[in-house]
């Protein structure tokens, strides 16, 4: 059967594998096809590195599954700890990307990922918010320790003072300097499908993204929000967020929009799960 191999450069190719093959045998076929030594290959499926001695069935590698191929560079003993941590961030982003199986979305995300990887060594932005600003007539919902606001698209926000100026021009470096709280900021959550509202959520930069998912589930339980029946991703700038990492680690900034996207599952996986 055929499986697809995505590379770090955004290109893809396919190989034919047999039912009982191990991961090592798959790598040997890649070496024969692409000329990449087995010792330099690292294969990922759904964000997990594959072990050479395990079989493809152990990882549920099915017809037209997509694997991510990372070519391991030669070790550099002089590499700084900072560069090592940044490389780990890149790897985790690529692993999260593997969770989306739809080919059209994969190509789109690959292009965005390339830009994010190119800029990963830039300094992280400052995250802060003077106060949570919401529309004058919006419904305010208290979720956990934060205040969230559900905003209709035609309503006007009521703001005042310095915080109003900060939101008016969030890209201005001068405005960023006058923000007082470096730990908290506001993200805008775009609901699923045809819900045209926008939910403003104040988050802590050091909180893991999975905390936002928990709050959204609570809102659904109260009948305030509709989430996909299937599994879903939280996506920012067209790239899935690593939910076990913080907003700061994911490079989510004040005023960014986070979308709720249904996770697509290959049809063959659904058939296999019912057998």
Curated annotation (Swiss-Prot):
Annotated ranges, domain Ubiquitin-like: 1-53, 185-263
Family annotation (PROSITE patterns): UBIQUITIN_2
Region (Disordered) residue spans: 74-97, 151-172
Main location, first listed in the record: nucleus
Record bears the keyword Mitochondrion: no
Annotated SUPFAM superfamilies: Ubiquitin-like (SSF54236)
One of the record's GO cellular component terms: nucleus
Bias kind Polar residues: ranges: 77-87, 151-162
Keywords assigned: Nucleus, Repeat
Record's keyword annotation contains Ribonucleoprotein: no
Localization of this protein: Nucleus
UniProt xrefs under InterPro entries: Ubiquitin-like_dom, Ubiquitin-like_domsf
Note: Transcribed by RNA polymerase III (pol III).
Entry's family note: Belongs to the ubiquitin family.
Name of the protein in question: Ubiquitin domain-containing protein 7SL RNA1
Gene: 7SL1
